[in-house]
């Protein structure tokens, strides 16, 4: 079984750790091995939160830069911050209005690394 590397990021209070727990429990329920790590220093004050989730035959809990298969960003700015974690051909899901991402200066990086991205206005959907 291969390893699937997932980075989840956002700001304190957005539910990054909760979303990580849901994905981890779902994977375990399906019989997959799960390893993870999280960083949430100033999260209580709206600071950056990042969670590493590795499914399958992972050696260690941290995901190296350029090796994540998926990046799930609950905040647009955090998507830019953690974009270097994505592998070439990785998939990026961002909580932002469609058409508002990416910034032009980042578009070239996304295109050259064949990153597939999808914008979902998740906050707006949740509030409606």
Language model feature labels by segment:
Residues 1-128:
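Active-site cofactor/cluster-binding pocket
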């Amino acid at each position: 079984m291969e390893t699937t590397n997932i980075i989840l990021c956002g700001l304190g209070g957005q539910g990054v750790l909760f979303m990580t727990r849901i994905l981890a429990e779902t994977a375990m329920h399906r019989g997959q091995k799960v390893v993870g790590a999280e960083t949430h220093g100033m999260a209580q004050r709206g600071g950056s939160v990042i969670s590493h989730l590795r499914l399958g035959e992972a050696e260690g809990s941290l995901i190296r830069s350029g090796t994540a298969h998926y990046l799930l960003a609950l905040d647009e700015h955090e998507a830019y911050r953690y974009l270097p974690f994505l592998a070439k051909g990785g998939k990026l899901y961002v909580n932002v209005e469609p058409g508002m991402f990416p910034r032009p200066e980042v578009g070239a990086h996304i295109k050259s690394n064949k990153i597939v991205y999808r914008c979902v206005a998740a906050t707006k959907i949740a509030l409606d």
